[in-house]
């Protein structure tokens, strides 16, 4: 039996690289080298069956993994980043104390090319777990008229943070995630 240690698994690196992108007034934070042990998380993801059963997210086009782990160790980091780069108006501790370990598992053929918002308030965060040779595309951001403003490229152990009301869509070049290759990213909704 495999045992899970959240303190080790979800430990954050002490030397992340932070970059605030500005897409025509839209702020998107990119943090590289986010987790100290991303290989442990990736191994856990690859060893967990993903499902199309998504009753809490009925419009999600792909599969996901949704497991209850203790993510409270992420609170201090997210509070700091949100207050530093955005307006802190959510209870991060409360959100992450109830948040599950949610992983989007998507292939090119099942992706929805239409930009969407996640919610009208709060923040969303994606953390990529595809290794370098698997990475393709990224996350596209749009204005309210569906004009593309910019792309954040997919990169292993990269965290992207943005407000949930911002229109976005996974950018996956045609045929990039097929067969046994899936786009895998941890997703957090804070707020």
Placement of each model-derived feature along the sequence:
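Catalytic core of non-heme Fe(II) oxygenases with the double-stranded beta-helix
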Residues: 100-191
